[in-house]
Amino acid sequence: MGRISEFVCPSCNMSWEARLGHGMGHAALGSVLEEFPPDIQQKILADTEGEQYPAFEFNYCPAVCWQCQKVVAVPVIYLHQAGQTYTAACPDCGNSIAVQTEDGEILCPHCGKENLTVEEIGRWD
């Protein structure tokens, strides 16, 4: 089950909600592929070709889009056998994003003055 996190800037009071983690529907590679654009889907399929049961880790991770100036959730997959990690672009503008660790500090993408606070506000599946 995934979690819903709220990111808040103590300086400018901007806030963002992000659905992080993964749901029960993300257990099979076929359903996870749908979360990525076609070019990344092809890379994932090429990297897992020949594997009967591909081993992978999938999660929606927090990321900062400096173009949109906000926090977004992006799909990230790690393929164990290939040792490859693939991350989708910003879901709003398509730009490359900077994936963040949830326990790390995230500078406010709106004002750039303070680190965001993070609070879990719900669950999703």
Q: What is the meaning of each model-derived region?
A:
Residues M14-N59, A73-L79, Y86-V99:
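Short recognition patches in nucleic-acid-associated and regulatory proteins
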Residues V71-A73, C111-I121:
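Short Cys/His-rich micro-motifs in 6-15 aa windows
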Residues I4-E6, F58-P62, Q84-T87, E105:
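Residues immediately within or flanking Cys/His clusters that coordinate Zn2+
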Residues C9-C12, C65-C68, C90-C93, C108-C111:
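Short cysteine-rich clusters marking metal-coordination/redox-active sites
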Residues P62, W66, V71-V74:
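Beta-strand-rich cores of mature extracytoplasmic or soluble domains
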Residues M24-A27, E105-C108, W124-D125:
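A short local loop/turn or secondary-structure capping micro-motif enriched for an aromatic residue
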Residues M1-E6, R123-D125:
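His-enriched metal-coordination microenvironments in redox/metal-binding proteins
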